Amino acid sequence: MKKEKFFQLAEVALSLLIVVGIYWLGENLKLPEKTIPVTPSIIEGRDEFYAGVIVGEKVRWVVGKKGKILRSESNGAGWNPQNSGVKKALQGIAAWDEKKAVVVGNDGLVLLTHDSGNTWEKVQLGNEGLGVKLLKVRIDPEGVAWAVGAMGAVYASHDTGKSWRRMARTQDIAWNDVGFSPDGKVWLVGEFGHVAFADPKHVDDNGEPEWQAVKVSADRSLMAVIFLDAQTALIAGLDGTLLRTKDSGKSWEKILLPTREHIFALASNGHTTVGVGSRGLRIVSQQGGSSWEVGRVAKEDFNWHTDIAIKGEEQLIVGAGLVQMNGRE
């Protein structure tokens, strides 16, 4: 019995020594610190992109939430972040070439690059542009940049974005998109079914074009406009709204689609026209907009997509993430 008790006491003592030793090591032993850098992903799950553009054979840009700008020089195979210098939402982007591009966003923000995005500089719209949410920017066939947005904002730049001039009076309308017809007219589409056009070569005493309102059979917000040729154009909007003209915009017919999903953007490569929108919606027409295939960007894609750029058979679709696909798919 005494022998067994001795061994029990020895085990307890040994356990106590081990605990004390571990405690002493924890308090006194200093191991060299090693810092492991954590590199954030270029494209993260919480990213939201609002606009994209394809330039030339390999260059692509996308812009979005919190001032994020990404550029690819490998046809979308890899992306590099660029420093916008801002944290505001960037709503639209257009490019003259692989070096010169313009971005618009919230609070009248305009960013300009002439060096492939290595640097982005802020451009002032003037006092009347302060606080105005700019929603879209596009470049017409003459190289003039047009930016549109809330409170009737319509601005134009004739010097690759260095300076801007207001081209319409302030009004309580948000213009969501701007498009160009082959005869040189500029078309605007906006909330509550508003549509207007003007010839920018004919201006009043204030230097503004004389905008003419167009009545269409839609009262939902219109989000996109595109001309396919001199006679044919399309307008798309919320709740599956899709309008088509075959007489250069004199009259517009409603095209009934088997969907009530929102259509946020339209793009065409000359023979294929594609629209994207809410809950993964993707509509495709090979017939100049007379008939449409209605589906999804991908089978399990229920994300929203706000913009699409097309060049040849390649498509860049942006929204809750990036989707790149071949137009033949």
Please report, for each region that a protein language model flagged, where it lies by residue.
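Residue-level hotspots at or immediately adjacent to binding/recognition sites across diverse folds
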Residues: M1-E329
